[in-house]
Amino acid sequence: MNDRLFISALRLLPKNALSRAVGALTRWRAPVPVRVAAIRAFARRYGIDLSECPDLDVYRTFGEFFARPLRPGLRPIAPGERVVASPVDGAVSETGRVEAGRLVQAKGIDYPAAALLGDEALAARFAGGAYATLYLAPKDYHRIHFPLGGRVTGWRYVPGKLWPVNPASVRTVRGLFALNERLVTVLETPLGACAVVAVGATVVGRVCAYYDPSIPFTNLPGAAPRRHDYETPIPVEKGQELGAFEMGSTVILLFEPGKARLDPRLAPGVRVRVGEPLGGAA
């Protein structure tokens, strides 16, 4: 099936409702033998390295496996307070600079930063700055880590659709990352302001943030846009867990102009892992 036929078929599906249904199923506490067998089958299908995970019988639900932690010490964090560490395991989708207020999604397709962030004033801070888009496949570790140390100054929740974010969708659905539901975490770091955008996708049941338990789970029926700026920002360390997806999706990093420089070797398709250096001070 070519990309356009695939997307046309997806337009007919109730993607948000489907994602909520799948999410509910992944939170079902099936008997341990059933749960472990399902996890092993999923791992074989997608090539997941189970040696990185705790014993499979510790997961109470399939969803807990999706958002699994890793064994300690498997993802060393690149040292240096001005070195940007990868927040996720995944593949580079695009990197570049925010030009004329827009980011590149794929060849011939771009979209506005203001729509992505749900905040024009916030988007203006990143005009001319570097950005990186990182795609998490179903096989990848699904937790998100802070790329730099600093303070969380606020967040934005933008409800939306739940299109897939696989390469076929990225090539075909215009403005995909500004259409899908997303959670934006805003940081002040040694490299200035940084936004970490967690973009939802089909059958990504929820995106959750660990730094503030009061932030609501995403993908709730009838959700409205929300924003919060902290009177007392939350201190965080580089490599600390920010949150998690319950399936694969996409994370987008944005930086202020003249502050951060990304490694030019980060071409589309290059694999990265949590903690690996993505760049540093401009």
From Swiss-Prot:
Encoding gene per record: psd
Main enzyme class: lyase
UniProt function note: Catalyzes the formation of phosphatidylethanolamine (PtdEtn) from phosphatidylserine (PtdSer).
Residues annotated as the enzyme's active site: 89 (charge relay system), 145 (charge relay system), 249 (charge relay system), 249 (schiff-base intermediate with substrate)
Record PTM Pyruvic acid (Ser), positions in chain: 249
Reactions mediated catalytically: a 1,2-diacyl-sn-glycero-3-phospho-L-serine + H(+) = a 1,2-diacyl-sn-glycero-3-phosphoethanolamine + CO2
Bilayer topology term: Peripheral membrane protein
Protein family (similarity comment): Belongs to the phosphatidylserine decarboxylase family. PSD-B subfamily. Prokaryotic type I sub-subfamily.
Cofactor binding mode and count: Binds 1 pyruvoyl group covalently per subunit.
Residues the record marks as site: Cleavage (non-hydrolytic): 248-249
EC number annotated for this UniProt entry: 4.1.1.65
Modification(s) after translation: Is synthesized initially as an inactive proenzyme. Formation of the active enzyme involves a self-maturation process in which the active site pyruvoyl group is generated from an internal serine residue via an autocatalytic post-translational modification. Two non-identical subunits are generated from the proenzyme in this reaction, and the pyruvate is formed at the N-terminus of the alpha chain, which is derived from the carboxyl end of the proenzyme.
Subcellular location, principal: membrane
PANTHER family listed in its UniProt record: PHOSPHATIDYLSERINE DECARBOXYLASE (PTHR10067), PHOSPHATIDYLSERINE DECARBOXYLASE PROENZYME, MITOCHONDRIAL (PTHR10067:SF6)
GO CC entries: plasma membrane
InterPro entries named among the record's database cross-references: PS_Dcarbxylase, PSD-B, PSD_type1_pro
HAMAP family: PS_decarb_PSD_B_type1
Subcellular location: Cell membrane
The protein's assembly and partners: Heterodimer of a large membrane-associated beta subunit and a small pyruvoyl-containing alpha subunit.
Domain of life: Bacteria
A GO biological-process term: phosphatidylethanolamine biosynthetic process
Gene Ontology molecular function terms on file: phosphatidylserine decarboxylase activity
Keywords linked to the UniProt accession: Cell membrane, Decarboxylase, Lipid biosynthesis, Lipid metabolism, Lyase, Membrane, Phospholipid biosynthesis, Phospholipid metabolism, Pyruvate, Zymogen
Protein name, UniProt field: Phosphatidylserine decarboxylase proenzyme
Pathway: Phospholipid metabolism; phosphatidylethanolamine biosynthesis; phosphatidylethanolamine from CDP-diacylglycerol: step 2/2
